[in-house]
From Swiss-Prot:
Residues 202-218 have a biased composition (Low complexity). It comes from Anaplasma marginale (strain Florida). The keyword Ribonucleoprotein applies. Pfam families: Ribosomal_L25p, Ribosomal_TL5_C. It comes from the Bacteria. The lineage of its organism: Bacteria, Pseudomonadati, Pseudomonadota, Alphaproteobacteria, Rickettsiales. InterPro entries: Rbsml_bL25/Gln-tRNA_synth_N, Ribosomal_bL25/Gln-tRNA_synth, Ribosomal_bL25_b-dom, Ribosomal_bL25_C, Ribosomal_bL25_long, Ribosomal_L25_dom, Ribosomal_uL5_bac-type. GO terms for molecular function: 5S rRNA binding; structural constituent of ribosome. The gene is rplY. This is Large ribosomal subunit protein bL25.
C-alpha cells in the first residue's frame, strides 16, 4: 500500500447496545464497534470478525486511512483501539475515529529498521538499542505513509539516530512532545570495553619500548 490508499471495512449500524447485545453479535461472528469524532454523534456499528481479523493480520490497520462503508454510506476514519480476548485473541471491540479529509490529523506510523545485522556498531560487538518503534506525525489523511524507514548501516558505537536525522516527506511534521528524541543508538558492551582495556597496556608498552630504543640510539 502507498500514500492515499485506504482499507475498506464494511459495517452496519446496530440499534441495540449493552453486554447482552455485544455477546450476541460475537456469537454470530460479528464485532461490536463504535465510531466517534469531534462535533459528531457516536455511531454504534458491527462488522465481520473474520474479515476484520484478516485485515489486522495483513494490513497496517492503525496507520492507514479506513474507508468505513456503513450500510452503503462511506465514511473515513482511523482505527484508534482494538480490544481482544486475552486467551483466544479474538477481536472483541473496535474504536474508530471519524476523519475530515480536508484537515490535518495526528497518526502513529510504524518505523521499519533496515540493516540491523549489518549495522557498523553491531558488527564491532556493540549493542543496538531501539528506543522508538513508531513516530507520531501530523499530516493530511491522504498523505499517511504505511511506514517510515530508518537505515542503521552506518550507525557506530556511541552514536545515535535522532528524529531530525530521518528523511521525512515534506507533507508531514513530527508531532511528538519530546523534542528531537533518539530513535536508535549503539552502546558499547562489556566485551567491547574489556577489549579496549586489554589493548591499552600493550599499546603503552609498545610506546615505552619505542621511546627507550630512540633514547639508546642517541
Amino acid at each position: 500500500m502507498s500514500h492515499g490508499d485506504t482499507i475498506r471495512v464494511d459495517a452496519s449500524v446496530r440499534a441495540k447496545c449493552g453486554t447482552g447485545s455485544a455477546r450476541a453479535l460475537r456469537a454470530a461472528g460479528l464485532i461490536p464497534a463504535v465510531v466517534y469524532g469531534k462535533n459528531r454523534d457516536a455511531v454504534n456499528i458491527s462488522l465481520s470478525h473474520a474479515d476484520f481479523l484478516k485485515k489486522c493480520r495483513t494490513l497496517p490497520i492503525f496507520s492507514q486511512l479506513i474507508k468505513l462503508c456503513i450500510d452503503g454510506k462511506e465514511e473515513f476514519a482511523l482505527t484508534k483501539e482494538i480490544q481482544k480476548h486475552p486467551v483466544s485473541g479474538a477481536v472483541s471491540h473496535v474504536d474508530f475515529q471519524f476523519v475530515d479529509r480536508g484537515a490535518e490529523i495526528k497518526v502513529e506510523v510504524p518505523l521499519v529498521f533496515l540493516n540491523e545485522q549489518k549495522c557498523a556498531g553491531v558488527k564491532l560487538g556493540g549493542a543496538l538499542n531501539i528506543l522508538h518503534r513508531s513516530l507520531l506525525i501530523r499530516c493530511a489523511p491522504d498523505a499517511i505513509p504505511q511506514s517510515l524507514e530508518v537505515d542503521l548501516l552506518d550507525l557506530a558505537i556511541g552514536h545515535s539516530i535522532h528524529v531530525s536525522d530521518l528523511a521525512l516527506p515534506e507533507t508531514m511534521q513530527v508531532a511528538m512532545k519530546e523534542e528531537n528524541p533518539v530513535v536508535a543508538s549503539v552502546s558499547a558492551t562489556a566485551a567491547v570495553e574489556e577489549a579496549k582495556e586489554d589493548g591499552a597496556p600493550e599499546e603503552s608498552a609498545q610506546g615505552q619500548g619505542a621511546a627507550e630504543a630512540q633514547e639508546t640510539g642517541k
